[in-house]
Amino acid sequence: MATIESILHENRIFPPASEFVRNANLSGREAYETLRQEAEHDYTGFWAKLAQQYIAWHKPFTRVLNDANPPFYKWFDDGELNISWNCLDRHLATQADKTAIIFESDAGEVNHCSYRELHRQVCHFANGLKSLGIRQGDRVVIYMPMRIEAVVAMQACARIGAIHSVVFGGFSAKSVYERIIDAGASAVITADEQIRGGRYHPLKATVDEALAMGDTATVHSVIVFRHTGTGITWQPERDHWWHDLIAGQPDECEPAWINAEHPLFTLYTSGSTGKPKGVQHSSAGYLLGAVTSMQWVFDYHADDVFWCTADVGWVTGHSYVAYGPLAIGATQVIFEGTPTHPHAGRFWEIIQKHRITTFYTAPTAIRSLIKLGSDLPAKYDLSSLRLLGSVGEPINPEAWMWYYTVVGQSRCPVVDTWWQTETGCHMIAPAPGAISTKPGSCTLPLPGIDAAVVDETGHPVEQGKGGFLVIKRPFPSMLRTLWNDPERFRKTYFPTDIAGGRYYLAGDSAHRDQDGYFWIMGRVDDVLNVSGHRLGTMEIESALVAHPLVAEAAVVGKPHEIKGEVVVAFVTLREKLPDDQRAAEIAATLREWVASEIGAIARPEEIRFGENLPKTRSGKIMRRLLRALARGETITQDVSTLENPVILEQLSQTV
């Protein structure tokens, strides 16, 4: 990779307020440095101490890091635990009646669920799963609305040792099908419909469509939560109502005591080539990362009301809805709806109503709320807030400043968190009582995380120069492998051409400034980041080419002030180059086709038609040139070898 020049020059810096520092879990820079040096001095001892402090073990571990077969690292692998017990049972003796979840529906109905009640619901459902023959090691796909029941389903799987794979409710039947097939799922947990922004979206019908695609005989049970009460098709031998399944089940369910390395879940994330990657996470190491980051980054206090707006279909919803807050004993808000329904101030109303202290959302949401004006948040009482967080993509400095000044009223630290589906929890983020923040920077690695910026051989790059972001040592919360694809795991994350395969390759480019702060510059592969969601170009291109009108397609990202990036598709048709009216008709058809094949999130913002696509002599599509066309930039590449230079003009036209 050629050296990347940083074009962002941001000099503003915000030290934490003295009152915040005084009450913080990591209080002052010295506290951060002490932990960082502990990890540097005794790496395995550092993680062992944290694992003993934050995790309740059924059988204590004696071995910390097993690195006998790199990069397939194992942590605490002779210990045993249960994740659900750590999230629920351990709190019953001291805070059974504390509110675990405040749920607010799309329509505004509010339900408070205590730790005692959540434990009871999880045990009922776990016993129901067992009654269907679902056992430890079985894979269960969860395709649910953003409700308490989604968390119950995940926790129930964890309780019996089943491996869950949650699919975002906006994904299509084909996406659900691919994940069912790859996971070899025994069961699917879903609902009749989901409600978002006043609109009803089918879930059970989508599951039925997925299961009708063939080769799904492994699925013996479909469990359906009755949400809207709409009519659905039913297969009596296969389908089970949630309420029937839990009826009469005992209030207790003995947890399965599993090995620390037993998979807790797989979560499918987009890759730059081919099918989605089934990221496989362990139990103990993953939970340790979720809990320590709640403590360090979110500075958790017992009276906090925590709200992470992410859906459980994404890793943020796993770590900071389903597991992290519950493991640390927090009260959190789960919201079913959208930021602006039924009115533009819905988010601010929720913060005011529930006295939220910690608010964690995506730059996409922040940018869309900025569009509505600064006077809107000012109409609500946001004085309960003490900490703001950003997740999913780098936040541009001006959005950071709006978030800090308008929402946080210039008194709440902003924690800009860099991490990935594969890392399981925060990697680079400010401990808000210890680290000064800079708009647009995720600041410094957390204690125990050895992050660096290197060139294509693994050597450090100069300060201010761009390079590959890597993590040089294994860490407990990292993915263990890709489901059924260990070789792809090795090649993707530990390529031998970078430091001999010793470093975890994040796939992001970054640079460090004079203070050692990290600045994320974007992806180095062909994965797009649309509204904080990673989408593989190969998947979208494959969907386009599957349409009978399309001969060839290439997809790139284009910066967008609200979504971060949008999808721009360059398409060659099987018919002649269409006129404007025909092009508009085809573009509309292809947009809906992609939405049905993958999901609405992947729908191209722009589609451009050409007689062919620009390629190198070896036949590779010239993606850099396409990116320049998409962004309206001056083309600096040598285009003299193009067989048909007129295509550049054709591909500059947006439909």
Swiss-Prot record:
Residues modified to N6-acetyllysine: K620
InterPro entries: Ac_CoA_lig (IPR011904), ACAS_N (IPR032387), AMP-bd_C (IPR025110), AMP-bd_C_sf (IPR045851), AMP-dep_synth/lig_dom (IPR000873), ANL_N_sf (IPR042099)
Binding-site positions, CoA: R196, G197, G198, R199, T316, S531
GO MF annotation terms: acetate-CoA ligase activity; AMP binding; ATP binding; metal ion binding
Positions contributing to Mg(2+) binding: V545, H547, V550
Gene3D superfamilies: 3.30.300.30, N-terminal domain of ligase-like
Recorded GO CC terms: cytosol
A Pfam family: ACAS_N
Enzyme Commission identifier(s): 6.2.1.1
Changes after translation: Acetylated. Deacetylation by the SIR2-homolog deacetylase activates the enzyme.
Catalytic activity: acetate + ATP + CoA = acetyl-CoA + AMP + diphosphate
Keywords: Acetylation, ATP-binding, Ligase, Magnesium, Metal-binding, Nucleotide-binding
Residues that, per the record, bind ATP: G392, E393, P394, D416, T417, W418, W419, Q420, T421, D508, R523, R534
Cofactor section: Mg(2+)
ATP-binding keyword on record: yes
GO biological process: acetyl-CoA biosynthetic process from acetate
Function recorded in the entry: Catalyzes the conversion of acetate into acetyl-CoA (AcCoA), an essential intermediate at the junction of anabolic and catabolic pathways. AcsA undergoes a two-step reaction. In the first half reaction, AcsA combines acetate with ATP to form acetyl-adenylate (AcAMP) intermediate. In the second half reaction, it can then transfer the acetyl group from AcAMP to the sulfhydryl group of CoA, forming the product AcCoA.
NCBIfam families found in the cross-reference section: Ac_CoA_lig_AcsA, PRK00174.1
Recorded family membership: Belongs to the ATP-dependent AMP-binding enzyme family.
Name the UniProt record assigns to this protein: Acetyl-coenzyme A synthetase
Species this chain originates from: Nitrosomonas europaea (strain ATCC 19718 / CIP 103999 / KCTC 2705 / NBRC 14298)
